[in-house]
């Protein structure tokens, strides 16, 4: 009897949004919910892609190197804004966050490569935080609209500072 094996393709998972450095008391750590999602999905066997923007600066170079080191595929634009950072302070063990504004991930553009990738996605993750700027909000909504109807859409709701409203969450 001939053995039949089924070849399964890896699911394609896309995270679009903030790529930033969390500036912790112990040092900096790469972060951003959609990119963290892609990292963990990739560790579980998915074909993961990060879509974001970084500045043409040392922090941008370092964070792209971090993605490469962790085998995270990416479509990262270099834009004329600083790479995103979040200052994290601990007060009596409780973290507080200062999320810096007018940074690279506030200026993500809907590239044709990103749209092509979204069309193949089995899951797409994005959040409210990266949609604080009009440009990134329109980009995230445009790119995610190209995902197949049956693709999972995961929304990270971030209720920090003033970067959300009822309309965005709905």
Q: How should each PLM-predicted stretch be described?
A:
Residues 9-10, 119-120, 149:
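Residue-level preference for short coil/turn positions at secondary-structure junctions
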